[in-house]
Amino acid sequence: MHYHIRGHKLFIIEILWMLGIASLSFLVVSHLGIFAASSPSHAAPFASSGDWPRFMYSDMHQGNNPNETILNTGNASSLTLKWKFKTPGSLIAEPIIVNGIIYQGSNDGNMYAIDATTHQQLWQTLLGRHSISTCPVSYGITGTAAVDIGMVFIGEGYTFYALNTSNGQIVWQTSLAINSNLADNVLWGAPAVANGKVYIGLASDCDKPLIQGILYALDENSGSIVASAKMVPDGFVGGGIWSAPTIDAATGTVIVSTGSVEKSPPFAGMSASVVTLDWNTLAAKQFWQVPASQRIKDADWGATPTLFPGPGGKTYFGCFNKNSTYYVFDEANVSAGPVWQVNLGVGGALAGINASFASSAYVNGTLFIAGALTTINGTSYASSIGAFDALTGQLLWRFGLPGRIFASLTTANGLLFDGQGKTFEVRDQSNGNLLFSYTFPSNSIKGAITALNGMVYVPSVDDKLYVFGL
């Protein structure tokens, strides 16, 4: 179990270590002063048609922009690079865009606000970097932010912050550490914001040591802890949550995926599981744990669940385990097990390499799923991308790719966006045909892509946000 919960974390460790970011020092200091506090000047709506306010667009995590009308299959081939924004650290968080402002977290420890029209930086706030002696790599901001009620919500290390959208000043901050060695506690993933609360999961740093995984619900206005849920019993470690919580507002449900556990029994509590919880109390409703026949060493769920509708008012969600099997569940009957599943790779502890953990996208009855190391028709590929009927699992199309896909998929107006290896790609949703590609200088696409208002925003581990348009 040496590599537990590392899926997302191991992938980050591998990326940053390869880039030498382990030794990166603070290069930028906020001119605002990170301990200053002020109230937001106004309350922003959840989203207008021109906003992308959450990781994968919304807290349902479908990765689809239903309001895109400019980009389409007829003009995607005409995309060109329009501008870039550089920070002193790698970018593995998805850019969030609200009211024409881009909110981008960087591994240099800063949250940046950038005007999407003028391309000028509006503010930056240094939240810091974290590291422990047992892991060789230090990190800044790894998770994607969320924007709501005039605040930017983001975690760094074991502290969760709310920043004023207009100036970046800290409105509130809350420590969520459970382990007395504070550096062992990390908020890796993106938050969900709903029901007047911010939901965020806690996991360990590099599994050295593991900690007890916890889901927190914080008051959106004050940051006070409203509720919490432990994924494994007291006395155990593991069950960390390093993906984003998914929200079903219609049923008042939070859905999370959890990591594995170290102590005997090897799968205690709700470790290595998908879990549904009440969004007010965080009391567990149901969970399903990977069965012994499908378990691998380090059997984490590293992907964020994708929520989608079904017939008869039913709601389903799909999620990848690091065994490279994609599972789909009936939300109302999770404990009964998946309604369908498909294996798309060899699986393993090394997320993004032989284990799949990219979150899927959903639109109009189709799931778009990217797997890791696989063999198709006798040929080995670093990854694959495919389309599946969301209710039956029927394969619609699938291609093997030479580069690894780390980031979650994005869709908009008939287009599918992915980053494989060092290549940003735009495909036709209907058949997977490649419409546009752009190759970066290095193996550099690890953050999810944002497609909004005719522009495509691609975060890169070469420290730049690349922006494409017609």
PLM regions and their residue ranges:
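Intrinsically disordered, low-complexity cationic segments
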Residues: 1-3, 7, 30, 41
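Core hydrophobic alpha-helical transmembrane segments of single-pass membrane proteins
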Residues: 17-25
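Sequence/structural signature of beta-propeller modules
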Residues: 25-73
